[in-house]
A protein has these predicted regions:
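Bacterial Sec-pathway N-terminal export signals of envelope proteins
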Residues: 6-51, 55-61, 172-174, 207-249, ...
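Sec/SRP-type N-terminal targeting helices
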Residues: 26-30, 43-44, 98-126, 176, ...
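Short segments within alpha-helical structural elements
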Residues: 184-212, 356-413
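Small/polar, glycine/serine/threonine/aspartate-rich low-complexity segments that form flexible
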Residues: 53-93, 264-297
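Periplasmic alpha-helical coiled-coil/stalk elements that build and connect Gram-negative outer-membrane
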Residues: 13, 37, 122-237, 244, ...
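Surface-exposed, polar helix/loop patches in the mature regions of secreted/periplasmic/lumenal proteins
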Residues: 80-148
């Protein structure tokens, strides 16, 4: 169910409503939550890493006393069995990172920049929503103007039809002339019905797109395009976000080359323990533990470092190229739009005069018909010429406004 229509929806209102109604807008909140959860998970890398372990093994061989020592112990009355081949261990290990070389910070930076890239790409899509609104909005305005002109044309034809009917009854005009202009009026009314159907359909489509009931769009005022600000365009912001992501990935790559320092503690209950000699003499479970510090350096990261850096450099080059392509196409688009605006303004400069002249010619034809100097075909020709002139005047105005507001989008103003 769409909200109730308000009188005179403006272009800005429709654009804002369309953005808020577009399903993709919901992803803004979802993206923010996803990024926040990812950052929270990465930050947990500073928490102690705890692992529990249960182990049971049977070995093919174990540490044993030399045979000479076993003989000596036997002579002394001692039974030295040595270690058993079945061994058991229940343990827990705790490790705490002290210095990770900047990996966690780098991962958080990459996650943040990835979130910004996703948001920037979505902003580009939402910016295109405004262009789609422009297309429908100005098409609706043009249909509205055509309906008004058809109504005016119907009134003119109806007035002349009435005159010809009267003249036909008096015998000063033929019945065929009356029927011809009546048929023309009915044809125009059919066209009006078709235009009204198109108008209703486009209203419904724009209403569904914006999420509000659009029935009476107002003609926007002619605006002057401000100087272009390309760096603020969503496409440029998306490219900047991708470049920052590439920089963050490069920093993370460097961080993976740094040594890492951690402290750890390990404890287990089982057999054998750390006191090997005691366990060789007595087969019993014992509690054992140790603490320490560990410095590690993953030299294996060197294997792919060169290729990884080259890949990031290529990504940056591709992004820069995309920026250049966008700026090139955007400049061409602005050039075309400015030329079209200038063309429509030049045409509009003489539209009023053409309409006035066509109106004068049409009125003269009506007078000639009343005095029997011309026929109805000449009159209908002049009526249509006047209507075409008025239609062209409306088209020039609406198309110029559309080009102005499309240029406003192109220049991000």
């Amino acid at each position: 169910m769409l909200p109730a229509a308000v009188c005179g929806q403006t272009l800005d209102e429709c654009q804002v409503a369309a953005e808020q109604n577009y399903p993709l807008i919901k992803q803004y909140g979802l993206m923010a939550q996803t990024t926040e959860m990812t950052l929270s998970n990465i930050q947990k890398g500073w928490l102690p890493q705890i692992s529990a372990m249960v182990q049971a093994t049977y070995q093919s061989d174990v540490t044993a006393w030399p045979s000479q020592m076993q003989s000596m112990y036997s002579q002394m009355g001692l039974q030295m069995e040595g270690l058993r081949k079945d061994q058991y261990r229940l343990g827990i290990d705790v490790a705490q990172t002290v210095y990770d070389g900047g990996i966690i910070r780098g991962q958080k930076d990459v996650s943040r920049e990835q979130g910004r890239v996703d948001e920037a790409r979505m902003a580009v899509t939402l910016y295109d929503v405004r262009r789609r609104v422009n297309e429908m909005y100005f098409s609706l305005l043009l249909l509205g103007e055509q309906l008004k002109l058809n109504e005016d044309l119907t009134r003119v034809l109806a007035a002349n039809e009435k005159k010809l009917e009267s003249m036909s009854l008096r015998g000063t005009a033929s019945e065929a002339d009356y029927k011809a202009i009546r048929a023309e009026r009915l044809t125009v009314e059919q066209q009006t019905e078709s235009l009204q159907s198109q108008h209703r359909t486009l209203c419904d489509v724009l209403s569904a797109f914006c999420g509000i009931a659009v029935s009476a769009p107002t003609k926007p005022a002619a605006c002057e395009a401000l100087p272009a600000v390309p760096e603020l365009h969503p496409e440029m912001k998306a490219a900047d976000a991708q470049l920052r992501l590439a920089d963050a990935q490069k920093r993370l790559l460097d961080a993976r080359m740094m040594p890492k320092l951690s402290v750890f503690a390990s404890a287990f209950y089982g057999y054998p323990g750390y006191n090997m000699f005691d366990d060789m003499m007595r087969h019993r479970w014992s509690l054992n533990g140790m603490i320490g510090a560990r410095l590690t350096w993953n030299i294996g990261a060197l294997y792919t470092r060169k290729a990884d850096r080259a890949k990031i450099a290529l990504q940056r080059s591709m992004i820069e190229n995309m920026r250049e392509v966008f700026l090139f196409n955007n400049r061409l688009q602005q050039l075309r739009q400015n030329r079209n605006i200038a063309r429509y303004r030049k045409l509009m400069a003489t539209d009023d005069e053409i309409v006035n002249l066509r109106q004068s010619v049409r009125k003269a034809a009506e007078s000639k018909l009343a005095h029997g100097i011309t026929d109805v075909n000449d009159l209908m020709k002049e009526i249509h010429s006047e209507n075409v002139a008025r239609l062209q005047q409306s088209i020039h105005e609406i198309e110029m406004l559309k080009e102005l507001y499309d240029l406003k989008l192109s220049t991000n103003n």
